[in-house]
């Protein structure tokens, strides 16, 4: 499936009964959040608020409110096919030459799709149909959501922030929330380890005191949006990965104020700069944890140009206690992660990030255990494998007979195969989510690994229990009798 732009995707969702147009006047202040939250919790459609109070621009919400819509956005027909996306990423992360002629032919479709990875630069693009500069730049024209009663100000949530460091060829795309500060200013909340923050830090080292160019694109095509939230290898541009997902090259156009590339079909584009040393207090905001976060200082993004398509659509979301849209993205991206971790650790059977755990704070891993201490090795591997997993506070490792996605199975394994003192691994002073107020220091906390596997000689001195299983012949006999017994008639 190919979507040239966000509007193509909206049309597809509408055809499939997965988009609802809301014609009543709805206030971006709290009302949109309440409607979107109720809809998402009922596994409802994406929402297009056509008459937002105080603005002429419609608001698109709940776009990726189900894992199925995430799969469609990635060009796949169903969620299970996202494993194929993970296979592509595993190959791109650690490419291997074909092992023979058969392997070469098997990989030809992927090699063909790799041809779509270079961007296609345009001289003109719809995202620059309307150009506003200077005093004409006014973010108050946009229906920016004020999501929760305790939020300090409206918040731009789905902006794709585009940056480039002084030492890299590739441009980085990331999604960072941005507090509305003034008609032409936002606060850029990015954490130190994120790509945009790294680019800014390196820029300040190379160009002390000089403004750092930044572009924020709102309402890009789904492949580009999802490319920005997928853990692509550091050497690969999100634009290139979006081309792989879309099966056609990502179309970009040069920004008006700098050399950064802008998604050609984006609905709204904000161009400007960060001035080193210019910061402002950000927050509090309700976040994906289900709590309001602390106030902290972050850099101010000054906007010099605002460009947009004719009849632009403002793309927005909210975050709150799961399930929310980030949690649904997490469920879908979980399927992408499985082939990635399996390539590094072939003994892994399944890898699950429960959405109740704020998408990444807890992982359940099932393995084909081969030796004493194997579970602990897997714990350490998970925490160190992808940058995203350094925020995972709890890793539970179980045997392959346990369904990682069934809490009945997992809790049974924890309570029958674990000794709390022997099988719990605690690690202090590790990187942790800055939004995790439970940690003793912001950004620094502990991790817990739970070894819920059967214990091998060397891990226990006792005879280990044998699981109960019914005789197979008896089960077959009862299967034959079952309907005639009439127990549930």
From Swiss-Prot:
GO terms for cellular component: cytosol; plasma membrane. Pathway: Cofactor biosynthesis; ubiquinone biosynthesis. It is found in: Cell membrane. Binds 1 prenylated FMN per subunit. Gene3D superfamilies: Single helix bin, UbiD C-terminal domain-like. It is a peripheral membrane protein. Keywords: Cell membrane, Decarboxylase, Flavoprotein, FMN, Lyase, Manganese, Membrane, Metal-binding, Ubiquinone biosynthesis. Its cofactor is prenylated FMN; Mn(2+). It is an enzyme of class 4 (lyase). Homohexamer. This is 3-octaprenyl-4-hydroxybenzoate carboxy-lyase. The gene is ubiD.
